[in-house]
Structure formats: C-alpha cells, structure tokens
Amino acid sequence: MKKSTWIRITNRRNEKLEKIHVNHVDLFYEKAGQGRPVVLIHGNGEDHTIFDRTAHLLEEKFTCYLPDSRGHGKSQWTGEFHYRDMAEDLIQFLEKLNLRDAAVVGFSDGGIIGLLAAARTNRITSLVACGANTRPEGLRILCLTGMKIHHFFSRSPLMRLMIREPDIRDEELAEIHADTLIVAGQHDLIRKSETDHIASEIPGAEEVILPGESHGSYIVHSEKLAEIILDFLDGKRGEKF
C-alpha cells in the first residue's frame, strides 16, 4: 500500500538515524545532545525533521530523541493506525532505551500520543502537548469536513485515523501526573474550547494560547517552540507568552 503524501515533509538534516524495534514495528530516530531526555513527536504525515531548529537549540542542554512515528519517515509502514498503538510505541521506546524523567513534546498527532502515553507511564515527568485534541469533534468543523472529503477520495489510512480517533476520556487525562503545558495557536485547527477542556482535566496543567499563530506555524522548522520548551522546563511557566 502506498504511503500517504498528505503534508509530506522532506528530510533536511541528513542525519544518521538509529533503529529500534518496539511494539512489533521498527522505528527510526535521531539522537543528539546531552542531558535530560526530551522526546519530540511529530504530527500526521510529517517526520522528525520538522523539529530541526527546535532540536538544534535544545541539544545544548538536553538529549533530544526524534523518532519517526510508525508509518512516517523511515519507520515501518503498518497499513492501519491507531493512536493507542502509537502511544504504546512511545512507552516501549522509553522503556527499551531506559529513559526516565523524560520530557515529551508532541505536536498535533504527537500531542495526542503524548497525552495517552503520559496517562500510562511515570517515565514521562514533563509533557508539552501542542495542537492536540481528545476527539475528532475537537477540530474546527471546516477542518474536520475537509479531512473527511480528503479521505473519501484518498482512502488514506493516516487520514482515516484523524477522522475516527482519538477517543481520550476525561478519566485518562486525570491520570496524567507529569508537569503539563497545553499549547495552541490563536488560529489553530483545534477549537479553543477543546484546548481549554484538555488543560482543565489534567491536574495542575497550564495552558498557553499563542497570539497570531496557526496550528503549526510555531512548530515546523521554527525556533519558537524551543523557546517555549526551555522556559517551561526551566520553570518559567510561560512568562513570555
């Protein structure tokens, strides 16, 4: 089956990737820097290189792990996708590499994966979830409608994932005990009410809405995300935003 070409992001770092086998799939990832582990999870149809500028700034203080999610980049194509499987990929990734006190930064689908994983493992002690939703209806109606039309013609498994899932329950959000920052752009594809709800259901979570930003404008090949991460992990708690 041909891979989806929706929002295909090209590899710009030309780095040497490492391979790991978790949850019955082979994942490829980049590792750089030294210090506390930070795992950056990209969104649907992308690969880890969207975080090129972010990782460059973080690796002076942290060990950055940038995996390609299953079915993305160079990682194994599985043909069918579910967010809970991808969250299990992340949990086993942390376990197999023996990463503890990890910070997970997820964008869009990566944010969903981060929420699900953080509810199930204490290896994640900090979480930054950007542009995430707990259900398809958390997307703005025009966005969700566009995805359904796209899927009707493409039958893309990755597009089907977004229009049928996630299904994260409030009880699961309440199980997240990591220090959590929920981020969205002012003009995000995610409804503001959805972002507010996620932040309200996670104990002690903080929320930042970035003025003038869209769903991925502060993420993809941008240094703005690194500033947010550094401030959050340094305990500045969004003072600049």
Regions found by a protein language model. Give the residues of each.
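Conserved hydrolase catalytic core segment
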Residues: 100-136
